[in-house]
Amino acid sequence: MNRARVKICGITTPVDAALAVALGADFVGVILAESPRRIDIARAALIRAAVPSALLVGVFRDPALDDVIEAVRTADIDLIQLHGHERPAFCDEALARTGRPVIKVFNSNTVPGVAQLAAYTTTSYFLFDTNKDDSIPPPRRLHDVAAIRRMGFRVFLAGGLNPGNVRDAVAATHPFAVDVCRGVESSPGVKDPVALERFMAEVRA
């Protein structure tokens, strides 16, 4: 079984981006939607320059397609994460217009069924945000995510992950990747180097 990849999201500075990549993060996420961690495209471009070897993920919520295209061009974003109510047709168009893979996020308490996921025919990855607090995601939702992963979908697991629970979450689901934001922060948008290093070590354990 391949190790789970790691996405560190909510990066707001080139320094934190470089630290995440130095510790082994595969994906660096920048939030371009309304959020305490939101940054503008110019800042995203600076982060891109700081980590040229990493995969940069731009996070959007119900965006205009032109805004996605501009962000991809300006900040050289590698993957488009859609965190709102985007329909399959929008995901298709985002891929067609940018050439960048799409990560579609589902935030509901119930993980969507296979038929719903299958409608996203050109979507490369699905991210399941299974919990909003700092506890390990509920067992039933972990079971659902694991079942979907076994069907061949490439799954990012997110929600409530931190250094204290990520090892168990990975063991329960064997996701393609884990996604952490708040669980490795000292304050919104500021990463805690110690927590970040511990998180990476637990994923690799």
Model-identified regions with their sequence ranges:
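Conserved N-terminal beta1-alpha1 strand-loop-helix module at the mouth
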Residues: 1-205
